[in-house]
């Protein structure tokens, strides 16, 4: 067996001539001594085939035939080690490729290590984050339950419970312990649910809102605020100094005047009593005060309504003159203010504006009943 046969199979992928083998053996030995990475086991290609020695007699730089080229390419592709892939490996090339293999190995190992280490802390943080969120939800629920201590609609409030509570272990009779029906506020136990529902808890306090003007009690502040609007005078009544008494009467029916106001009055009132000088916020309060404390009720000077048939006063709506009876008032209007009066042709009503007379005729005397009323009405003598 020739000297360079083993070196050719172990170190070189392609066969070379015998003239170069002596130099390459020295270089291969130098590389094997200096570089430890070249000691990797290389999978030999075509092991034990002596025909490769005879084909290597040709020059490695220039193959003689295409079959030799094809064999060289197949050997290069079938090699497993990157070091043996070249036909003429040198010492610097081998030293460059060895650390590359080491770097690849270390980089792969580092990558796998980093991936494992990065996944583990992420899972730890996720596991730690879940109980924290549950604690936050529990704290929210506790705070919400603590805030539910008042009921503004029902007017109830729950007092703070005592620090030390002594639960009852047995009932009064001592037969069996009471723990099934217990009040959650005062911790008092009862034998049946009916007695638990009927008991009055000591921690529940009823809140009452009192009106400062009429002393009425309300359980809700919103109801008190809506009630106090009735005590305030309307701005429209202040702007219009001649309010209609019919509207005032309807509004006074809805109002509930307080006894304190009717007796003592208020300083901010708009209506003055002519007898005692007291002021009242509403005309209904003044009327009640006059009827209760003074014999001859008198109303403050105000314009009378246009329709005299529905009114109770006897003032002339044009000049304001007072008359003892209604007949004298109508006679005065016919004689003195005949040009400003619009009498109704179908009834004795009189109006002081054309739109008022028209509205009265359309409402009280429709077109179907006008002729019947005309036949029944007596002829009015001219004055």
Curated annotation (Swiss-Prot):
Q: Where is this region: SNAG domain?
A: 1-20
Region annotation Disordered: where it falls in the sequence: 99-141, 229-269
Function according to Swiss-Prot or TrEMBL: May act as a transcriptional regulator. May play a role in neurogenesis and neuroendocrine cell differentiation during embryonic development.
Q: What is this protein called?
A: Insulinoma-associated protein 1a
Which key words tag this protein in UniProt?
Answer: Developmental protein, Differentiation, DNA-binding, Metal-binding, Neurogenesis, Nucleus, Repeat, Transcription, Transcription regulation, Zinc, Zinc-finger
Locate the compositionally biased regions of type Basic residues: 130-140
Assigned GO CC terms: nucleus; transcription repressor complex
Keyword Transcription regulation found: yes
Q: Where in the cell is it found?
A: Nucleus
What SUPFAM superfamilies does the entry give?
beta-beta-alpha zinc fingers (SSF57667)
Q: Name one GO biological process term.
A: negative regulation of transcription by RNA polymerase II
Describe, by residue range, where the zinc fingers (C2H2-type) fall in the chain: 209-231, 271-295, 314-337, 342-365
Regions of compositional bias (Polar residues) in chain numbering: 105-120
Is Repeat there in the keyword field? yes
**Biased composition, Basic and acidic residues: where in the chain?**
244-256
The molecular function terms of the Gene Ontology recorded here are: chromatin DNA binding; DNA-binding transcription factor activity; DNA-binding transcription factor activity, RNA polymerase II-specific; DNA-binding transcription repressor activity, RNA polymerase II-specific; RNA polymerase II cis-regulatory region sequence-specific DNA binding; sequence-specific DNA binding; zinc ion binding
Q: Which InterPro entries match?
A: INSM1/2 (IPR042972), Znf_C2H2_sf (IPR036236), Znf_C2H2_type (IPR013087)
Q: Which organism is this protein's natural source?
A: Danio rerio
């Amino acid at each position: 067996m020739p000297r360079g046969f083993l070196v050719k199979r172990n170190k070189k992928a392609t066969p070379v001539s015998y003239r170069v083998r002596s130099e390459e053996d020295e270089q291969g030995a130098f590389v094997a001594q200096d570089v430890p990475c070249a000691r990797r086991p290389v999978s030999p290609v075509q092991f034990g085939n002596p025909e490769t020695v005879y084909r290597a007699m040709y020059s490695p730089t220039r193959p003689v035939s295409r079959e030799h080229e094809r064999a060289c390419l197949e050997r290069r592709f079938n090699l497993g080690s990157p070091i043996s892939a070249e036909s003429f490996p040198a010492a610097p090339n081998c030293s460059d490729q060895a650390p590359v293999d080491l770097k690849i190995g270390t980089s792969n190992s580092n990558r796998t290590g980093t991936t494992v280490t990065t996944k583990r802390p992420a899972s730890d943080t996720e596991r730690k984050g879940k109980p924290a969120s549950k604690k936050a939800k529990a704290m929210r629920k506790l705070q919400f339950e603590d805030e539910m201590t008042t009921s503004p609609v029902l007017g109830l409030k729950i007092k703070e419970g005592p620090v030390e509570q002594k639960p009852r272990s047995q009932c009064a009779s001592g037969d069996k312990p009471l723990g099934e029906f217990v009040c959650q506020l005062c911790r008092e136990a009862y034998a049946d649910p009916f007695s638990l529902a009927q008991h009055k808890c000591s921690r529940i306090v009823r809140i009452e809102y009192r009106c400062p003007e009429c002393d009425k009690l309300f359980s809700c502040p919103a109801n008190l605020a809506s009630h106090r609007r009735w005590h305030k005078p309307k701005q429209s009544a202040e702007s219009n100094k001649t309010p209609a008494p019919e509207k005032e009467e309807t509004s006074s029916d809805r109002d509930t005047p307080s006894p304190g106001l009717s007796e003592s009055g208020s300083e901010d009132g708009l209506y003055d009593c002519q007898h005692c000088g007291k002021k009242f916020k509403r005309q209904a309060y003044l009327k009640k005060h006059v009827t209760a404390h003074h014999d001859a009720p008198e109303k403050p000077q105000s314009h009378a309504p246009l329709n005299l048939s529905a009114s109770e006063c006897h003032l002339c709506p044009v000049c304001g003159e007072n008359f003892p009876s209604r007949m004298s008032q109508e006679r005065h209007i016919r004689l003195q203010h005949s040009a400003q009066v619009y009498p109704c042709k179908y009834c004795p009503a009189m109006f002081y504006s054309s739109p008022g007379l028209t509205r009265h005729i359309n409402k009280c005397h429709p077109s179907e009943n006008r002729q019947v009323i005309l036949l029944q009405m007596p002829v009015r003598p001219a004055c």
